[in-house]
């Protein structure tokens, strides 16, 4: 249970950059309208040097599958989401990492425990809540890498991940 106005949601296997909190709270502090969520770039930790939960050295992923996902993440976060952010049209703040306005999350019904795409489901409900009530809001994507995650090492694991993501999207629509 969160006690403050904003909370971070992240996956258990993620490593957060040391100055993550500073990076993601700045758009909230600089905004004149409610920032309901902030997303940041996620990268693959495969191949990086991590010591006691701290990223010591960034290296490209080892292996074709993690390299594929790293490239896909960079395209998604640095090109697509940064572009959508400029127009306040981000459809989803990643479940892997995001800062959320606690009050809006609660008002929108919170996470659906039955959803397989809880990140997109909740983001869409938050946006719907704000639009239906004619409330000004922003969802911001920052270019900074704040979160590192272990990418699927094999095609089989990647397939399971993508199947779950696909089921979640179908469940929402």
Task: Indicate residue ranges for each PLM-predicted region.
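Acidic donor-binding loop at a coil-to-helix junction in glycosyltransferase catalytic cores
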Residues: 116-122
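Alpha-helical scaffold elements adjacent to nucleotide-binding pockets in ATP/GTP-utilizing enzyme cores
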Residues: 23-24, 122-125, 161
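A short, conserved beta-strand element in the Rossmann-like catalytic core
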Residues: 15-16, 43-45, 121
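Long helical/loop segments within the catalytic core of UDP-sugar-dependent glycosyltransferases
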Residues: 1, 23-116, 130, 163-170
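Catalytic donor-sugar/metal-binding loop of nucleotide-sugar-dependent glycosyltransferases
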Residues: 114, 125-147
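Short aromatic/hydrophobic "clamp" motif used to bind/position activated sugar donors
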Residues: 7
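Acidic donor-binding/catalytic loop of UDP-sugar-dependent glycosyltransferases
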Residues: 12-27
């Amino acid at each position: 249970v969160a006690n403050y106005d904003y909370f971070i949601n992240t996956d258990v296997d993620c490593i957060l950059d040391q100055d993550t909190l500073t990076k993601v709270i700045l758009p909230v502090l600089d905004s004149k309208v409610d920032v309901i969520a902030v997303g940041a770039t996620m990268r693959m930790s495969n191949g990086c040097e991590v010591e006691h939960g701290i990223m010591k050295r960034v290296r490209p992923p080892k292996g074709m599958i993690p390299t594929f996902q790293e490239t896909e993440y960079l395209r998604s976060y640095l090109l697509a989401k940064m572009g959508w952010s400029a127009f306040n049209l981000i459809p989803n703040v990643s479940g892997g990492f995001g800062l959320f306005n606690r009050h809006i999350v609660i008002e929108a019904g919170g996470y659906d425990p039955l959803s397989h795409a809880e990140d997109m489901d909740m983001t869409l409900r938050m946006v719907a809540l704000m639009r239906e009530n004619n409330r000004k809001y922003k969802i911001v994507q920052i270019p900074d890498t704040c979160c590192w995650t272990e990418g699927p090492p094999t095609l089989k694991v990647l397939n399971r991940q993508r199947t779950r993501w696909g089921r979640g999207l179908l469940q929402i629509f």
